[in-house]
């Protein structure tokens, strides 16, 4: 019983420290988790780090599954942490309900590129977002303006706190999104980290202005391979 009470208290403490912020963007209900270390004041200049979850992931999942609790790093190094939530829905494909969430990194919402289709003829087909129009058979991510959504989050945070530098990191589809943000708004970020999130063939981008940028790829990763080969589910990626 003592263990159960302790776990409940820990959960309540976690919920209290991470504020869920809700907003309407493009007529959709969107949200993100905001974590501000106790020693940071609104008048103090501080850094902002944005963490983006992967495909089918959650904002809270990114925090808890990254380095044993990413907000602990915010406490240790003194920065504000934000975990946006990708647009999500429940798919009933193959007679089973599946939670789907993703980011529109301007690649996964397409099928055709200047280099051909982003997936092979025998590729696995993933549930498509109800709001996506004419995405094609390879389309698997949200079609919403997620770049603008993240930028809006930054604007709202700047209205409340004195932000010095902004960093964004993402895992898998979140890494793809981080790279897209670097290409779209290179002057907005001090640093960008893409972890195992290669872009689809023909859609890889390079920022047109200098930005600190790191891509991590797994040499034996068959889901999102770091080299130009077909992935295990039949999709094509490139660094």
Task: Write out the residue ranges for each language-model feature.
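Sec-dependent N-terminal signal peptides
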Residues: 2-12
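A domain-start/cap signature at the N-terminus of enzymes
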Residues: 13-48, 60-80, 142, 148-151, ...
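Solvent-exposed loop/turn segments at secondary-structure junctions
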Residues: 40, 54-58, 87-91, 172-176, ...
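The feature captures the conserved acid-bearing segment of alpha/beta-hydrolase catalytic domains
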Residues: 40, 68, 75, 190-239
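Short, solvent-exposed loop/turn and secondary-structure capping segments
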Residues: 44-46, 59-64, 92-104, 179-181, ...
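N-terminal cap/lid subdomain of alpha/beta-hydrolase-fold enzymes
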Residues: 47-90, 96-109
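Alpha/beta-hydrolase active-site loop
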Residues: 104-161, 180
């Amino acid at each position: 019983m003592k263990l159960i009470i302790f776990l409940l208290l820990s959960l309540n403490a976690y919920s209290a420290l991470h504020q869920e912020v809700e907003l309407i963007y493009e007529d959709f209900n969107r949200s993100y988790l905001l974590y501000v270390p106790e020693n940071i004041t609104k008048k103090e200049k501080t850094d902002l780090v944005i963490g983006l979850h992967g495909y089918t992931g959650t904002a809270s999942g990114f925090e808890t599954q990254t380095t044993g609790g990413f907000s602990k790093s915010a406490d240790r190094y003194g920065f504000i942490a934000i975990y946006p939530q990708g647009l999500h829905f429940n798919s009933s494909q193959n007679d089973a309900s599946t939670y789907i969430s993703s980011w529109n990194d301007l690649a996964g919402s397409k099928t055709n590129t200047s280099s051909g289709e982003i997936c092979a003829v025998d590729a696995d087909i993933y549930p498509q977002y109800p709001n996506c129009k004419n995405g094609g058979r390879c389309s698997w991510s949200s079609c919403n303006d997620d770049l603008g959504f993240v930028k809006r989050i930054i604007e709202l945070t700047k209205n409340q706190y004195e932000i010095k530098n902004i960093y964004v990191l993402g895992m898998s589809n979140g890494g793809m999104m981080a790279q897209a943000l670097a290409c779209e708004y290179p002057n907005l970020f001090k640093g960008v980290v893409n972890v195992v999130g290669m872009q689809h063939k023909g859609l890889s981008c390079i920022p047109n202005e200098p930005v600190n940028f790191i891509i991590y790829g797994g040499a034996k990763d068959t889901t999102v391979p770091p080299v130009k080969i077909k992935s295990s589910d039949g999709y094509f990626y490139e660094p």
